[in-house]
Amino acid sequence: MPRYLAKAAALFVLPGCFGPGSILLTQQSHAPGSQAVPTPEKAVSLAEEGRCRESIAGLKHAMTVTTVAAEVRKQAGVLGVRCSLAMDDREVTNEFIRALTKQFPKDPDVLFVIVHAYSDLSTRTAQDLGREAPQSIAAHKLNAEALEMQGKWEPAQHEYEAIIQKDPNVRGIHFLLGRLFLSRPDAGPEAAEHARQEFLKEITIDPSNAGAHYVLGELARRDEKCEEAILQFSEAIKFNPSFAEAYLGEGLCLVNLKKYEEAVPPLRTAERLTPGNPEVHHTLATALQRSGHKEEAEKEFSIHRSLTSGQGSESPQ
């Protein structure tokens, strides 16, 4: 099993908080269901003592009874998550997570527990993958992504390249390799061109990869090849009509080409999709101002000023 595979889904939180060692499971001599379901209070007490198998049915029941005090239901849900993870019953864990999310959607303690529960579930699933199919493309991909997130660029690149060597036409890997070239700080001056070649290979394999089209558009735009960039942004939008950044990129190119009226529709769409993006409002304001819509332009400049809150924004001359 690749060394970093088990860490892939647990990079931002502490893994293993609810692992099998976190709660001692009391072995039961009786068959399941041979006792009545304990009351919510009794179930909580049993779970706190580590008697998870005895308590789990009562904890589940407590979450469904509206007459049970909210604090007891919350405690039952949290203990239910911990117990079910200790028992490695992932289906029940997800049931408790759903119940907690529905009943206590903004409670910070609940959200904290859910974050760690998802981390634990992700780690266990990654371990399943490494155990069941350690040489699969999926396992190598997960390992590469984990290495990349840790800033271990060279090993990650080798993982992606090994996948491509194994199957040159696998979808998504050329895109990930291209993204890595653009992300690594030590990639050198040829990184953008290496990345561009990978994105071109990706859209040859998978023409519907909107992300690859978008990055190709951005690379062309930064090289001041706006006509080429617009074609790529249009392809990205075709395959992902909610791709706000692609609409913005198209609008920026049209403004650079002084096609101000043509720039307004994609920028309006970008504004609708990402109303909190200051760059969208400033670019739209510029297009409106230079196409003669002074009043609308000033409104957009005003929104931009409010979003940047004192950073200093000026209307173009």
Q: What positions do the PLM features span?
A:
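Helix-start (N-cap) detector for alpha-helical repeat units in TPR-like alpha-solenoids
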Residues: 36, 70, 74, 108, ...
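N-terminal leader/linker segments that initiate helical-solenoid repeat arrays
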Residues: 22-71, 75, 309, 315-317
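Bacterial N-terminal signal peptides
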Residues: 8-20
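Structural signature of tandem alpha-helical TPR/SEL1-like repeats
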Residues: 54, 86-95, 118-128, 151-162, ...
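Structural marker of alpha-solenoid helical repeat scaffolds
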Residues: 65, 69, 103, 132, ...
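TPR/TPR-like (Sel1-like) alpha-helical repeat modules
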Residues: 115-119, 269-312
